[in-house]
C-alpha cells in the first residue's frame, strides 16, 4: 500500500486547524503521514497541532520562525517520506474518501498527478467548482489544459502528486504572491500522465484576511507576471506547441481592475497596464464583464487613472 504524505503549513489558524485535522483522521485510506510545519504561529495553533501529534504517531510537527508560505511548503516537502504528496491548507478540510478515490485513480490510470474539484466555503455557502468530466491525459495535454484554465488550476491543493513530481521543484521563496503558479506547472512537467476527476473532494475555506481581502497592485501584477513566466517556459520547452494564455491574462486583468476599484483612491494615482489579450479567445459574456469593470474604473478614477500600454 502506497504511503501518502499530507503536507500542512500552519500559521495562526486556531479556529480552523482541528476541523482540518479531523477531516484527515477520518480518511478511509489509512497509510498516511501528516507533516505539520508551524511557521512561527502566534496563537494556539501550535498547541493544537502538538496535542494531535501526542495522540497519533503518524502526525509530525516541526516549528520554525516565520518565513512565509513558500518556505513552509518547501520544508514540508523536505520532511515528507511518502510515495505521494497531498497539500492541505490548515484552514481547509477534505472529504473522507478523498485520498482513497484519488490514489485508486492514480493507480488505475498510471497517473503521477490526480486533480479533483472543490467547494468554496464562504459565509455559510458551499459552492462547488468542478472540472465537469473525468479525463486522463499526457503531460503536454495537461499543460495545455492548465494554460487555458480547463479542468486544471494553479492551486497546489486538491491534487495528489507522485513524489517524483517534486524532484528539483521548489516553491519560490522570493515571490510575494501567486507562488503556486510558478510551481504547479513544473510538477506537471515532471508527470507523464495526469488525471482529472470531477468529484469535489476538497473544501477551500475563504475567510477574512485572505489575499483578496487586502490585495494591492504589486500582488495583482504579480499574478500576471506568474502567467507570463509560465507561458515563456512552456514556449521554450515546446516551441512548436500553442499555449493560449488569454483566459489567464483576462483573469489577471480582472483581478487588477478589482484591486483598483476596491482598494485604491483617486489621490493615489494608480497605474493600469492592460494585458495583451486575443479577445477572440474570450467568451462574449467575459468580454462584457471586462468592459463593465473598465467602465467602473474610469468612472471612479476619471483622468487620475494612469493608462499605460503593455
Model segments located where?
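Catalytic core of nucleotide-sugar-dependent glycosyltransferases
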Residues: 201-207, 213-241, 257-279
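N-proximal low-complexity "stem/linker" segments adjacent to membrane-targeting elements
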Residues: 1-26
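Conserved donor NDP-sugar-binding/catalytic core segment of glycosyltransferases
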Residues: 97-129
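Glycine-rich, basic loop-to-helix element that forms the pyrophosphate-binding segment
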Residues: 64-80
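Short aromatic/hydrophobic "clamp" motif used to bind/position activated sugar donors
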Residues: 85
Amino acid at each position: 500500500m502506497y504511503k501518502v504524505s499530507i503536507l500542512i503549513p500552519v500559521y495562526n489558524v486556531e479556529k480552523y486547524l482541528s476541523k482540518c485535522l479531523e477531516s484527515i483522521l477520518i480518511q478511509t485510506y489509512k497509510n498516511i503521514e501528516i507533516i505539520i510545519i508551524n511557521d512561527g504561529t502566534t496563537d494556539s495553533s501550535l498547541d493544537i497541532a502538538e496535542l494531535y501529534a501526542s495522540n497519533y504517531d503518524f502526525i509530525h510537527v516541526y516549528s520554525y520562525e516565520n518565513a512565509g508560505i513558500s518556505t513552509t511548503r518547501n520544508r514540508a516537502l523536505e520532511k515528507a517520506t511518502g510515495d505521494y504528496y497531498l497539500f492541505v491548507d490548515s484552514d481547509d478540510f477534505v472529504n473522507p474518501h478523498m485520498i482513497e478515490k484519488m490514489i485508486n485513480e492514480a493507480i488505475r490510470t498510471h497517473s503521477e498527478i490526480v486533480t479533483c474539484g472543490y467547494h468554496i466555503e464562504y459565509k455559510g455557502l458551499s459552492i462547488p467548482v468542478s472540472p465537469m468530466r473525468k479525463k486522463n491525459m499526457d503531460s503536454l495535454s495537461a499543460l495545455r489544459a492548465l494554460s487555458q484554465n480547463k479542468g486544471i488550476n494553479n492551486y497546489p491543493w486538491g491534487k495528489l502528486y507522485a513524489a517524483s513530481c517534486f524532484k528539483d521543484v521548489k516553491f519560490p521563496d522570493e515571490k510575494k504572491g501567486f507562488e503556486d503558479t510558478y510551481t504547479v506547472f513544473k510538477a506537471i512537467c515532471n508527470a507523464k500522465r495526469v488525471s482529472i476527476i470531477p468529484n469535489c473532494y476538497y473544501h477551500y475555506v475563504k475567510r477574512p484576511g485572505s489575499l483578496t481581502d487586502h490585495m494591492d497592485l504589486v500582488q495583482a501584477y504579480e499574478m500576471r507576471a506568474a502567467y507570463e513566466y509560465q507561458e515563456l517556459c512552456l514556449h521554450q520547452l515546446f516551441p512548436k506547441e500553442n499555449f493560449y494564455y488569454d483566459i489567464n491574462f483576462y483573469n489577471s486583468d480582472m483581478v487588477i481592475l478589482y484591486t483598483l476599484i476596491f482598494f485604491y483612491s483617486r489621490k493615489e494615482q494608480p497605474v493600469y497596464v492592460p494585458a495583451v489579450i486575443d479577445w477572440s479567445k474570450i467568451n462574449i459574456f467575459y468580454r462584457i464583464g471586462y468592459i463593465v469593470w473598465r467602465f467602473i474604473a474610469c468612472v471612479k478614477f476619471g483622468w487620475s487613472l494612469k493608462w499605460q500600454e503593455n
